[in-house]
Regions:
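Bacterial N-terminal signal peptides
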Residues: 8-22
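N-terminal secretory signal peptides that target proteins for export/translocation
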Residues: 1-5
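Secretory-pathway/luminal and periplasmic proteins that interact with or process carbohydrate-rich
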Residues: 45, 114-117, 257-259, 499-505
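A mature extracytoplasmic/lumenal domain signature
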Residues: 50, 61, 254, 338, ...
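Aromatic- and Gly/Pro-enriched helix-to-coil junctions and flexible linker segments
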Residues: 21-165, 173, 177, 245-251
Length: 513
């Protein structure tokens, strides 16, 4: 042994022993210093009086009372609700807990939920009363309450709300307040500058008028709200535009819950004196909630896949992404493939939850050069083992407006440098949708074609078979080589035919004008 090296090491260790023995033991995990900051920041926004959380988490006693449950739902990732896979994409509004934070809660529960020094408990964040974004510049409320029955299928109803604007306005934020959040599932906003919505409303004796989607393309799509959506101001100086004299048309999807109730929802607008900093829009893949995707899920299918791709024709920057499906949705994924072959995730969620649909806002805008391909994969579980399956035993499920039907779309919010880039992207989306319409017509499956005929937007109503058959015959007449398909050259006049007719118009506008 080299004693010259051994003894200096022993001497050094001996010098440190007194300090090691005097070291403070680890501080126990307490509510005041460790748990309260996590709960107040990540949970209380929903778990407070008047919000969607079923109970409040606003102080030590309320959190202690639910401590075991909190430990369980944070441990399995159920709460806080955040369904994008961790570590794949960075989002600025990520409210999920990190593994160390989850372990901290588990340690606190295991230790018996000690409070610690109450003086060290942080103050609750300042939450606005009523409107989550603060008092709006304009609060628009449904003129009349609508009676929602206790039982029955989903209801799609449009309500006209006059805005009475005497000048054009730019809008930086919109907040929807459901009158009865227990029955309001999701909504779509439209603007009507034609007066048609008032005419439709006047013809219907009940408040509002029946319908899903746009009525013959008269209304301009503005946006929407789903369960789980949190209102936020548009980022990067972006704005919505509302022309003077426009009416707001709110399409509400009601889901009867066994109790008769009334709903009189409101929409709050926050105005901006500045116009939008850049043109912007949305890229839905596939368009219009997947209506022309041909979604057809066999009974018992454990993992039914639907895929769609769209090539972006112009340079743009993505700033947010959102997914939509119904109860059978399982995985929702969007990936960008660049022209050099490299790829980048935009959304990857392996645990889709119908009850929580929100915008995922990128930490930084993502540049998507012209020629970037957006690849979407949507997975559905129609097996008896799916606890969310609304039908037992499982049945075949196709596209439809009701929650027991299915939909599927991933929507990317993007910014452009010029309006010409934006319009070119809209036109590419119209062509994409026209190709899907052609595919469905040639397949002869009209299960999701009702709205194309101008009067059969909902199942059970007599379908426009004559117009669909006529359109199908017109397409087959373009099959010059008689192979029962339309090749690339044959599709050129077919696409022109679809775009010039009422088919795309009846499906509504693509993006924002």
């Amino acid at each position: 042994m080299d004693f010259h090296r051994f003894f200096p090491a022993v001497t050094a260790l001996a010098a440190f022993l007194p300090a090691m023995l005097r070291a403070e033991p680890p501080r126990p995990v307490t509510f005041s210093e460790d748990i309260a900051p996590l709960v107040f920041q990540n949970c209380t926004v929903c778990h407070r009086p008047g919000q969607i959380g079923p109970f409040a988490l606003t102080d030590y006693e309320s959190v202690k009372r639910r401590a075991k449950q909190i430990g369980e739902v944070t441990g399995d990732g159920t709460m806080p609700p955040w369904h994008a896979d961790r570590g794949v994409v960075e989002y600025s509004n990520d409210r999920s807990l990190t593994p160390p934070q989850i372990a901290l809660i588990a340690d606190w529960v295991a230790a018996g939920t000690p409070e610690g020094d109450p003086a060290k408990t942080p103050a609750l964040p300042l939450f606005p009363e009523g409107w989550q974004m603060g008092k709006p510049d304009l609060a628009a409320t449904m003129p009349e309450a609508y009676l929602v029955p206790a039982e029955g299928k989903d209801i799609y109803r449009k309500f006209v709300i006059p805005l009475n604007l005497d000048q054009d306005r730019w809008v930086k934020g919109v907040e929807f307040r459901p009158g009865d959040p227990k029955v309001v599932h999701h909504i779509l906003y439209y603007l009507d500058t034609t007066g048609k919505a008032r005419e439709y409303d006047a013809r219907d004796p009940a408040p509002g008028f029946r319908g899903m989607g746009q009525s013959n393309g008269e209304f301009r799509y503005l946006g929407g709200w789903d369960l789980g959506s949190q209102p936020t101001e548009l980022p990067y100086g972006l704005r919505w535009f509302i022309p003077k004299g426009a009416d707001l048309v709110v399409q509400i999807n009601y889901h009867p819950n066994g109790r008769e109730t009334t709903d009189q929802s409101s929409v709050g607008f926050h105005f901006s004196d500045e116009p939008t900093a850049r043109p912007w829009s949305i890229i839905p893949v596939p368009p219009h909630f997947g209506m022309m995707q041909g979604i057809d899920i066999p009974a018992g299918a454990k993992e039914h896949l639907e895929e769609a791709s769209f090539v972006i024709p112009e340079d743009c920057e993505a700033f947010a992404v959102n997914a939509h499906a119904h109860y059978l949705g399982k995985r929702m994924e969007m990936r960008a493939t660049f022209k050099d072959g490299s790829t980048r995730w935009l959304l990857k969620t392996s645990n889709w939850d119908f009850q929580w649909q929100e915008d995922y806002i990128f930490q930084q805008p993502i540049k998507l050069p012209a020629g970037t391909r957006l690849d979407v994969l949507m997975s559905y579980d129609n097996s008896a083992e799916n606890p969310n399956n609304p039908t037992h035993p499982p049945r075949r499920v196709v596209w439809g407006p009701f929650t027991t039907d299915e939909m599927g779309v991933i929507t990317l919010s993007v910014m452009f440098d010029t309006r010409e880039q934006k319009e070119a992207t809209h036109q590419a989306l119209r062509v994409f949708l026209a190709n899907q319409v052609i595919d469905r017509l040639l397949e002869g499956d009209d299960s999701a074609m009702g709205p194309l005929g101008g009067g059969a937007a909902l199942p059970g109503k007599a379908g426009p078979a004559k117009s669909l058959d006529a359109a199908r015959s017109r397409l087959l007449a373009l099959d010059f080589d008689k192979d029962s398909k339309l090749g690339p050259l044959e599709r050129i006049p077919a696409i022109q035919f679809i775009l010039q007719g009422s088919f795309i118009k009846n499906l509504g506008a693509i993006g924002f004008d």
